[in-house]
Design a protein with these regions (language model features):
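N-terminal secretory signal peptides
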Residues: 1-36
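A short, N-terminal "cap"/entry segment at the start of jelly-roll beta-barrel domains
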Residues: 37, 43, 48-120, 220-300, ...
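Histidine-centered metal-chelating micro-motifs
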Residues: 128-130, 149, 168-170, 174-179, ...
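Mobile, glycine-rich extracellular loop/lid and propeptide segments
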Residues: 130, 140-143, 149-152, 161, ...
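Short histidine-centered beta-strand/loop micro-motifs
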Residues: 130-134, 161-162, 181-182, 310-315, ...
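Glycine- and acidic-residue-biased ligand/ion/polar-headgroup-sensing regions
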Residues: 134-155, 314-335
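Short acidic-glycine-tyrosine-enriched beta hairpin
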Residues: 155-173, 335-353
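Ligand-binding loop in jelly-roll beta-barrel domains
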Residues: 166, 174-200, 354-380
């Protein structure tokens, strides 16, 4: 055999070896791709009877793994603690004058109360809260004691003069000038509510303050007063000033052609028929029945001893409470495991943020009366009893992990105010 033949045979043998090696590597690669994991089993095994059996085993393994694997909860967010929601309005210093007092609460004193400011004002007989207006806030008021006469002027020239007694309320839109006077015989106490927590009663636009800032010449030309009379006017804001008790029948306006408004600013809240519940009653007045009150809703709630105003929230507005008489505990819920409970007495204020869950528990032997306001045009509420009654029983059983018998004991309609120690 020649050297050439021997070389050809050697080359052929070498090629066969390379081919065999290539096939072996390819086979190994394929086998490597078919490792027996759950993913490769489900992805690579044909869905024959054997394949389905393997897939079933893989699914069972997944379920077992899920059962064995502990639940991973999301990391708890660090939320700030709930803000203080209690303020002693009548216990504050405020303004003390010869014929009246005024104590206010704004965000400066009560940071949580961003949307509402309030004033507790007392006028002695004849006392006048002078002519003034509010540039940034509307004024809503509720008379607790005494008798008050108001005058107000609208931008289209309509004027009103109204008398108010206990249980009456008024509303003056932002920028409408007005004045208040106690008709006697006793002190008049009323609560003023403003639809802006940054508003200060001590920063209103008062007529004496303005007159004192204008040159006598300009003021004389504009008011018709002599320079001698102007020299004797107050040198600054009078705010609350003494006055003579006016006649019981309102005196006519100086302008005989004045456009008289027909009590559009007045509403007799306590004459409204209340909603009655086992533990008390409530009167709510919003713009649907008091059309001028576009920015504040008012309510009076009376709770009998031991009553519970059920858990609820307001989806459209914050809530501002003033305690007129009696005591109560208020509990609020601010999500993320945050809650707070405070006890309230007469003269104190509570503020609950929009959407925060809360309840009111009456305490003590004396009934409790609360003035409640909301910076909104319409009253809205979601109560827990209504929420529970408008869901299927099976869902509630599974949500709470309780029995059908337990769910059957839950309220099936709105409860609002529970009676003493009642459980629904």
């Amino acid at each position: 055999m020649s050297d050439e033949s021997n070389g050809s045979e050697a080359m052929a043998a070498e090629n066969e070896a390379k081919l065999a090696g290539s096939e072996t590597n390819e086979t190994k690669s394929r086998l490597g791709d078919l490792k027996l994991t759950r993913r490769s089993l489900l992805g690579a095994v044909p869905l024959t009877t054997a394949g389905l059996s393997l897939a079933s085993l893989a699914g069972a393994g997944r379920a077992d793994a899920q059962q064995m694997k502990p639940q991973i909860r999301r990391e708890k967010r660090k939320e700030p603690p709930l803000e203080n929601f209690k303020y002693d309005l009548d216990g504050s210093t405020g303004f003390v004058g010869e014929v009246g007092t005024a104590k206010e609460v704004t965000v400066a004193e009560f940071p949580v109360s961003e949307s509402i400011a309030g004033v507790s004002m007392v006028l002695k007989p004849g006392g006048i809260r002078e002519l003034h207006w509010h540039a940034i806030a509307a004024e809503w008021a509720y008379v607790i004691d005494g008798n008050v006469r108001t005058t107000v002027l609208g931008p289209t020239g309509e004027a009103a003069q109204d008398d108010f007694g206990p249980g009456d309320l008024w509303y003056f839109p932002k920028g409408h000038p007005h004045a208040l006077q106690n008709l006697g015989p006793g002190d008049a106490h009323f609560i003023l509510v403003f639809d802006d927590g940054h508003f200060s009663e001590f920063g209103t636009f008062s007529i004496t303050d303005w007159f004192s800032q204008v040159s006598p010449d300009i003021l004389s030309r504009d008011s018709g007063l002599s320079l001698q009379t102007i020299a004797g006017l107050p040198k600054g804001e009078a705010y609350i000033t003494p006055g003579r008790i006016p006649p019981r029948s309102p005196a006519p306006f100086r302008d005989g052609d004045a456009i008289i408004s027909q009590s559009a600013h007045k509403f007799r809240m306590l004459e409204r028929e209340p909603q009655k519940w086992p533990g008390g009653e409530e009167r709510v007045v919003d713009s649907h029945i008091f059309p001028i009150s576009k920015t504040i809703v008012g309510a009076i709630m009376d709770l009998q001893p031991g009553a519970l105003r059920e858990m609820h929230w307001h989806p459209n507005a914050d809530e501002w409470q003033y305690y007129i008489k009696g005591r109560a505990r208020v509990g609020i819920f601010g999500a993320h495991g945050r809650s707070k409970v405070e006890e309230f007495a007469p003269g104190q204020v509570a503020f609950i943020k929009q959407g925060f869950g809360h309840y009111i528990e009456q305490v003590g032997d004396e009934p409790t009366r609360i003035l409640i306001t909301f910076p909104a045009a319409e009253y809205q509420e979601i109560s827990v009893s209504t929420w529970l009654s408008n869901n299927p029983s099976l869902l509630l059983e599974d949500n709470f992990g309780i029995s059908a018998a337990d769910v059957a004991r839950m309220p099936k309609s709105k409860m609002a105010i529970y009676g003493p120690h009642s459980k629904g």
